[in-house]
């Protein structure tokens, strides 16, 4: 798993002032099963089981909640992540 969130200056490309890449990769696989990112020029989007779709970014808290929700769905583990 990789969770990277950068605070960046607000700009036309990045009005929220945030860049991010959140990835969950299953053991023994190389491609992420869940990936949220907002690289240029695509902007906010996510990949769930290899299917890319737009993502409606609101704030970092919502981003983290949505990411955890998708990982829980694909792993079937309602307690993920364990502390």
Question: Residue spans of the language-model regions?
Answer:
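The feature represents the first ordered module of a protein
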Residues: 1-45
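Generic detection of intrinsically disordered/low-complexity segments and helix-coil linkers/edges
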Residues: 14, 18, 30, 49-51, ...
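Beta-strand-rich cores of mature extracytoplasmic or soluble domains
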Residues: 43-48, 53
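Short, compact, well-ordered microdomains
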Residues: 51-82
């Amino acid at each position: 798993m990789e969770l990277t969130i950068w605070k960046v200056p607000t700009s036309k490309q990045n009005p929220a002032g945030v860049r991010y890449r959140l990835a969950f990769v299953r053991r023994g696989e190389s491609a992420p099963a869940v990936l949220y990112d907002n690289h240029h020029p695509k902007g906010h989007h996510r990949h769930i089981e290899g299917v890319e779709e737009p993502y409606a970014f609101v704030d970092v808290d919502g981003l983290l909640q949505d990411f955890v929700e998708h990982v829980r769905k694909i792993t079937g583990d309602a307690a993920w992540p364990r502390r």
